[in-house]
UniProtKB/Swiss-Prot annotation:
One of its GO terms (biological process) is immune response. Residues 1-19 form the signal peptide. One of its GO terms (cellular component) is extracellular region. The keyword Membrane applies. Keywords: Adaptive immunity, Cell membrane, Disulfide bond, Immunity, Immunoglobulin, Immunoglobulin domain, Membrane, Secreted, Signal. Residues 112-122 are annotated as: Complementarity-determining-3. InterPro entries: Ig-like_dom, Ig-like_dom_sf, Ig-like_fold, Ig_sub, Ig_V-set, IgV_Light_Chain. The gene is IGLV4-3. Gene3D superfamilies: Immunoglobulins (2.60.40.10). Residues 69-75 are annotated as: Complementarity-determining-2. This is Immunoglobulin lambda variable 4-3.
Length: 122
């Protein structure tokens, strides 16, 4: 029985002069190979309509864009991201769900605020 570990680190990137949101994530998670796992990124309540972006970072590599997740739960994936990666939303929470976990999914996962509110850049 093999486990896959995930390390979660929120970060913020923004180009506007608006107050910055606070993003929180649990520090780590793990699951069995072949299982599913849901990672959570929580926005501060006053920024609950913001869009976030999920990134995967393996040791010694640059972050790889996975997807954007909007407040309505819709998501758009980066090039080459498999169908087993899904995004969703509930209130101020944005989720990244993996199904059929594979050993190469073990990495750090970052969520970042993309400074998009209801489809408009702020």
């Amino acid at each position: 029985m093999a486990w896959v570990s995930f390390y979660l680190l929120p970060f913020i990137f923004s180009t506007g002069l608006c107050a910055l949101p606070v993003l929180t994530q649990p520090p780590s998670a793990s699951a069995l190979l072949g299982a599913s796992i849901k990672l959570t990124c929580t926005l501060s309540s006053e920024h609950s309509t913001y869009t976030i972006e999920w990134y995967q970072q393996r040791p010694g590599r640059s972050p790889q864009y996975i997807m954007k997740v909007k407040s309505d739960g819709s998501h758009s994936k980066g090039d080459g991201i498999p169908d087993r990666f899904m995004g969703s939303s509930s209130g101020a929470d944005r989720y990244l769900t993996f199904s059929n976990l594979q050993s190469d999914d073990e990495a750090e996962y970052h969520c970042g605020e993309s400074h998009t509110i209801d489809g408009q850049v702020g």
